[in-house]
Structures are given as C-alpha cells and as structure tokens.
C-alpha cells in the first residue's frame, strides 16, 4: 500500500493541542461608584470585554444593574437585611457612575418577621417623584399587643386593616410625590417613613415591624448628565474658579 494513503499517518496531524488563550486577557476592570447619598461610594469592580472595532465597552456597561448590601454602603451591620440596586448610567474613564434602581429585603428577614398571633398588613402604591421617576413602593407592617392587654393574640379586624392600609398609602404617596429620587433614598436609609406610619396608625391599631419592604423602578425620565454629576457631587454649578492672588500687582510692576 502506498505511503500517501496510510490513514494512521494522515490522522496524526489532527491530534495537536490548540493554544489555550486566557479569556481575561480580552477583558478590563471598571470601578463602580455609588451616589453621594451613601457613605461608602466604592461599591466594587466589574468586568467587560475590551473595546474592539465597532464594539465599545461603554455601551456594554451602560444599563448594567448591580445589587449591593446596604450594610456595605453605609458601613453598619444594622442595614444588612436590605439590598440596594444600582444602575450604571455613565462611564467616565475607569469609573462607572450609578443611580438608584430599587431596593428589596432579604428573604430570611421577611420570613423572620412573620409570626403567629398577629396580623400581617401590606400596601403598595405607584407614584411619580418630583423629578419624574415612576416608582412602586411596597410597605409591610404587623400588629402588636395593646397596652395592658391580657389576651395572647393581637388580630386586627377587617375595618382596621382597611383603615391602616389607607393611611399607609396616603403617607407613601405624599412622601414620594414631594421628593426627588435622591431625597427619597436618603429617607429610606434611616427609615423615617416607617416611624411616621407607626405614629399615624397607633390610634387605629398599634403596629410593629413597619418597613418599606421593596421599591421598584417602573419608569425613568430622559437621561440628564448634569443631574447625575450633581448626584455624585461632581460638576455642580457652585464650583467657582479660585482667585489668583498677587497677579494684578505683578502685571502692574512689569508695565
């Protein structure tokens, strides 16, 4: 048999190993920056493919949503059960400027609050902020024993539940409509709205564990770079040029 027709020799070339290329050589790191509303602005890093040809890395990063624990943003473990969503709106060099995109509770926190011998009350409203962000806000509350109560249970009647739900909806609507998205975020962190709901409903039925459980962003206005820069404490109109001392005197002396 001729050598050129030997199948074993012809198949030997196909067994060569291909050169392994590290996929991370085609990627680059970017720093995620949280708005100035939070104490810790350095959220972390994210990966993206490098810009090649018509594909720009900035286009792949814009709109990316990251989920961060509020305890990491505030430096306090008291907020460990709340998760904040941040959306990348602008790319500046190696920094990604983000904006608030939503909030949620961890599953274990919600389950730990649900107990027997009490009534769970939930309410949600869809409201537009003063800067045209449409949000759906979810609130949760639980009844508790009244003062000097002997009975073990603290169940609320249907009329009480409807009245409490109405008060919660009114407070949420008023607080959201009268605030910008940044102002609302600053109210959600110290739970100012929760205490207001608890005080407003104490005459109907005493409540405990009142929380804004979830905030969902439904619609956002047209992107404004100036507003985003002001949110991150950069490029505000209050910055003025520094006065150059002694410049006028030096010019007069030379003349």
From Swiss-Prot:
The modification N-acetylalanine is found at residue 2. It comes from the Eukaryota. InterPro entries: Ribosomal_eS1, Ribosomal_eS1_CS, Ribosomal_eS1_euk. GO terms for molecular function: structural constituent of ribosome. One of its GO terms (cellular component) is cytosolic small ribosomal subunit. Keywords: Acetylation, Cytoplasm, Ribonucleoprotein, Ribosomal protein. Pfam families: Ribosomal_S3Ae. The keyword Ribonucleoprotein applies. Disulfide bonds: none annotated. One of its GO terms (biological process) is translation. It is found in: Cytoplasm. Signal peptide: none annotated. PROSITE patterns: RIBOSOMAL_S3AE. Component of the small ribosomal subunit. Mature ribosomes consist of a small (40S) and a large (60S) subunit. The 40S subunit contains about 33 different proteins and 1 molecule of RNA (18S). The 60S subunit contains about 49 different proteins and 3 molecules of RNA (25S, 5.8S and 5S). Belongs to the eukaryotic ribosomal protein eS1 family. This is Small ribosomal subunit protein eS1. It comes from Vanderwaltozyma polyspora (strain ATCC 22028 / DSM 70294 / BCRC 21397 / CBS 2163 / NBRC 10782 / NRRL Y-8283 / UCD 57-17). The gene is RPS1.
